[in-house]
Amino acid sequence: MGYFVPDSHIENLKSYKYQSEDRSLVSKYFLKPFWQRFCHIFPTWMAPNIITLSGFAFIVINVLTVFYYDPNLNTDTPRWTYFSYALGVFLYQTFDGCDGVHARRINQSGPLGELFDHSIDAINSTLSIFIFASETGMGFSYNLMLSQFAMLTNFYLSTWEEYHTHTLYLSEFSGPVEGILIVCVSLILTGIYGKQVIWHTYLFTITVGDKVIDVDTLDIVFSLAVFGLVMNALSAKRNVDKYYRNSTSSANNITQIEQDSAIKGLLPFFAYYASIALLVWMQPSFITLSFILSVGFTGAFTVGRIIVCHLTKQSFPMFNAPMLIPLCQIVLYKICLSLWGIESNKIVFALSWLGFGLSLGVHIMFMNDIIHEFTEYLDVYALSIKRSKLT
C-alpha cells in the first residue's frame, strides 16, 4: 500500500458511511430541491467526480479573469467581470451540491467521492480569496492574509469536527450555503454600483485615545467574519465535546481525555499560522501570489490528510511536513540576508516560489498516491464509471 494509507487501515474503506446534518433553511427549501432537478442535466454515465471538477473549472476561469484584468488585486475591472464571478461562484456551488445527488442517483457514492469533493473545496478556499480581494481592491496586503486565514481556519475546523464526530455539520448559517450566496449577491452589487460604493463607503468614526479610525463597509465585513469564525470554532468544539460525552463506551475520565486529545489536533494548524504571521510581519513583501498559493496547497494537503485518516480510521495526523515551510523560509531569509548579503527582494522571490513548488509537489504526490490506493482497493475509476458498475 501507499505511504499515506497502511495495509492495516485500507480495508476500513469498506465500512464507509456518509453522515451529515444540514440545519440550513435555505438549503432545505431552496437549494436542495433545485439541485435535485438540476442534476438531471448530467447523463447517468458521467462520473460524479467529473461534475466536481467541472464546478471547480468555473472558479479557475474566474481566477484567470481576475489576474488578466487585475493582477495586483487593487484596481477597477470591467463591470461585466463581477457578474461573471457571481455566475462562476454560483455554478461552483451548484455543481458541488449536485455531485453528491448525482452519485446517489446512479448508486456511485463512496469514500473516493468524499475525498475528491472536500479536496477540491480545500483548494477553492484559497482561489476564491483572489476573487474577493479583487472585488474589494485590498491588493496583496495583510487583509488578504487575514481573509485566507479565516477561510482555511473555517475549513480546517469543519474537517477536524467531522474527523471526530463522523458527521459533517452545516449550521443554520454556513459558508458553503448562505456564505456563498452572500458572495454572489455582493459581486452583483459590485458590478452594478462599483467597488468603491459597496466596499469603501464611510460609515462612522471610532476614537481610541488620540487616534481617530474611519470605519467603512469593508471593516464591518471583516468584523462579521471574525465573529463568524469565533462562532464556528465554538460550534465545532461543542459538537466534538457532545459526541464524546454521548459515547456510551466512555467513562467520564476517558471522555475528558478524548476531548483534550481532540483539542490537541488544532495546535499544528495554529502553530503553522503563527509561523506565517511571523514571516509576513518580518518581511511583508512575502505576501505574493506564490506565497498565498503555497499556504493554500499546504492547507489543502493538511485537510486532505485529515479526511483520509477519517475515512480509513487512522490516528489524527499531528505532523505534516509542508507546515514547516514558513519556518524554513524565516531561517533561510535571515541567513541569505545577514551572512551572504543577498538583496531582500531576490531572497523573497526565490523563497516564495521555492515554498510554492514544495507545497504543490507534496500535494500532487499525496493526491496521486491516495487516488491510486482508493481506486485499486475499491475497484473503481476516479473520473469514469466501470462498465461492471453501470449494470
Swiss-Prot record:
Names of required cofactors: Mg(2+)
Regulation acting on activity, per entry: Requires a divalent cation activator, and is inhibited by CMP. Activated by phospholipids, especially phosphatidylcholine.
Pathway: Phospholipid metabolism; phosphatidylethanolamine biosynthesis; phosphatidylethanolamine from ethanolamine: step 3/3; Phospholipid metabolism; phosphatidylcholine biosynthesis; phosphatidylcholine from phosphocholine: step 2/2
Parts of the chain on the Lumenal side: 1-49, 194-211, 283-285, 343-346
Reaction catalysis annotation: CDP-ethanolamine + a 1,2-diacyl-sn-glycerol = a 1,2-diacyl-sn-glycero-3-phosphoethanolamine + CMP + H(+); CDP-choline + a 1,2-diacyl-sn-glycerol = a 1,2-diacyl-sn-glycero-3-phosphocholine + CMP + H(+); CDP-N-methylethanolamine + a 1,2-diacyl-sn-glycerol = a 1,2-diacyl-sn-glycero-3-phospho-N-methylethanolamine + CMP + H(+); CDP-N,N-dimethylethanolamine + a 1,2-diacyl-sn-glycerol = a 1,2-diacyl-sn-glycero-3-phospho-N,N-dimethylethanolamine + CMP + H(+)
Cytoplasmic side stretches: 70-172, 233-264, 309-321, 368-391
The keyword Transport belongs to this UniProt entry's keyword annotation: no
One Pfam family it belongs to: CDP-OH_P_transf
Family: Belongs to the CDP-alcohol phosphatidyltransferase class-I family.
Protein name in UniProt: Choline/ethanolaminephosphotransferase 1
Gene designation: EPT1
